[in-house]
A protein has these predicted regions:
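Extracellular carbohydrate-recognition regions
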Residues: 28-61
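Beta-strand-rich interaction surfaces with strong enrichment in secreted/lumenal proteins
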Residues: 33-34, 96-102, 156-162, 209-210
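Extracellular glycan-recognition surfaces and repeat-rich motifs
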Residues: 52-83
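Short tryptophan-centered beta-strand motifs in secreted/extracellular beta-sheet-rich domains
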Residues: 48, 112, 166-183
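Secretory/extracellular carbohydrate-interaction modules
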Residues: 78-147
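Short, aromatic/His-centered strand-loop micro-motif at the edge of beta-sheets
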Residues: 149-169
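Bacterial N-terminal signal peptides
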Residues: 9-20
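Flexible glycan-contacting loops in extracellular carbohydrate-active proteins
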Residues: 192-221
């Protein structure tokens, strides 16, 4: 075997080794990190490069579609008249995007990258409910966020710089009585008796609820969810 053949064989072996290493690392689950929990089991991971996960999001519908590696949620109807004609009612008309992430563990760590793509705030919108109608994360008028506990206090955090139309990198660590929120790298832990995601009236929970308001789309880029133990 001459020098050129040896060289080509060596290059080919190196390329195959790099490829196999890349494949192995790409298949590795994301690393678990937490300030509250010692261990966590990854139960859901999604970059929206395939079909909608029905267990977590429900069935795909015209207002909930995967596009270009994102899950995009839009209003079901564009006008009140159109909605009333289709639904045969005058309430819950689907004029704003609403979506749920289902089957949330009772103790968890969640990484989310998402945005509410809209230009202005309206009363109570957009909002992200951690537990249906429970802990609420919403925007401040001039940037930043507010966390409202159910039947409890609110916490205002301006340093996160959270703004409409911009990606939010969010980490949530939760167990009853304690929640840690890291919004765009700005993290704080809250301990209070009102920290709970359990809504006894919600037969489909615990779950996350996103409500966008008028003229809005909700866009998700990635989700990671761990079931945790202390």
């Amino acid at each position: 075997m001459n020098y050129m053949t040896h060289t080509c064989a060596a290059v080919l072996c190196s390329a195959l080794l790099c490829l196999s290493t890349f494949d192995a690392s790409a298949a590795d689950p994301p690393a678990f990190e937490s300030e509250i929990f010692k261990t966590g089991t990854l139960v859901y991971s999604d970059d929206f490069d395939g079909e909608i996960n029905r267990e977590r999001w429900g069935a795909p519908t015209k207002d909930k579609q995967i596009r270009n590696g994102n899950l995009v949620v839009a209003p079901k109807f564009q006008s009140k008249e159109e909605a009333m004609k289709a639904l045969k009612r005058d309430h819950h008309l689907g004029l704003e995007p609403v979506v749920h992430i289902n089957r949330i563990p009772e103790a968890f760590v969640c990484h989310l990258r998402y945005k509410f793509d809209t230009k202005k705030l309206t009363p109570g919108r957009p909002s992200f409910q951690i537990g249906h109608h429970m802990i609420v994360l919403n925007y401040l008028e001039n940037g930043g966020h507010r966390i409202k506990l159910p039947d409890g206090p609110s916490f205002t955090e301006t340093d996160s710089g959270m703004k409409l139309g911009e990606w939010i990198d969010l980490v949530i660590e939760y167990k009853k009585g304690e929640i840690r929120m890291v919004v765009n790298g700005h993290g704080k832990t809250y301990k209070h008796d009102a920290v709970t995601i359990i809504n006894e009236k919600d037969k489909l929970g615990p779950r996350f609820t996103f409500k966008g308001g008028p003229d809005c789309q909700i866009v998700f880029d990635s989700v990671r969810l761990w079931n945790c133990e202390e």
